[in-house]
Design a protein with these regions (language model features):
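N-terminal beta-alpha supersecondary unit
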Residues: 1-27, 102, 143
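DPxDG-like acidic metal-binding loop motif
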Residues: 22-51, 56
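Residues at secondary-structure transition points
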Residues: 1-4, 30, 34, 38, ...
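Generic hydrophobic alpha-helical segments
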Residues: 2, 6-9, 60-61, 108-112, ...
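Surface "functional belts" at beta-alpha junctions
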Residues: 50-146, 171, 176
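Acyltransferase
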Residues: 140-190
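Stable alpha-helical structural segments in soluble proteins, enriched in small hydrophobic residues
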Residues: 9-13, 46, 64, 149-160
Length: 190
């Protein structure tokens, strides 16, 4: 599980030795985001270690800082929707072209047509690539396709440090349970 892995990575170091802890706070699976953020909050709180909240999509884009390109970070949000953000990678920096969003495959296709070449990466890259059907898309190689610790660290470099109490998950849409509850309330009103 997560805590034994953290202990193994830390080796002889203690949590109190850290200057900050970076975490991808979303978007992503509701459970995965909650577990990651809660774990970091728990680790950081006791020793008052600053936290850095990083977009999962930005962490993915940071895998390409050695190239000048457009990166389309995508995560499967189900029902042919994707969590997505676009980044221009230039001179070793990722410049955000749009905010993190939940987007349909058709809307994403329209957005991507204006670029000459786009590298598509993330856990939704293969599904997205297979359904876009446009020529300017390149599927990222497996070794750069997914988020990794290095990408999180690079994305966190110039971000604001916050307290563990201020660290919160970032969700781009309601969970299925929240959507169903909202629908039930709406049905009761009618």
């Amino acid at each position: 599980t997560l805590l034994p892995m953290i202990k193994r990575v830390m080796g002889d170091y203690k949590i109190s030795d850290l200057d900050a802890i970076a975490v991808t706070a979303g978007p992503g699976s509701f459970t995965g985001v909650r577990i990651g953020v809660a774990t970091v909050k728990g680790l950081a709180f006791n020793d008052n270690i600053p936290c850095v909240s990083v977009s999962t999509l930005e962490a993915i884009a940071c895998n390409f800082l050695d190239e000048d390109c457009i990166v389309c970070s995508v995560m499967d949000a189900r029902r042919m929707q994707f969590y997505n953000a676009l980044f221009e990678i230039k001179n070793g920096k990722a410049v955000r072209l749009c905010e993190d969003r939940a987007i349909s495959i058709d809307d994403l296709k329209n957005d991507l047509k204006k670029y000459e070449k786009v590298i598509i990466a993330g856990d939704g890259a293969r599904l997205c690539y297979d359904n876009l059907g446009i020529d300017n898309i390149i599927l990222a190689p497996e070794d750069k396709r997914y988020q990794c610790g290095q990408g999180v660290a690079l994305a966190a470099e110039n971000k604001e440090k916050i307290s563990a109490a201020a660290l919160m998950p970032v969700y781009l849409r309601l969970s299925q349970a929240e959507r169903e509850l909202k629908l039930q309330k709406k049905d009761k009103e009618n």
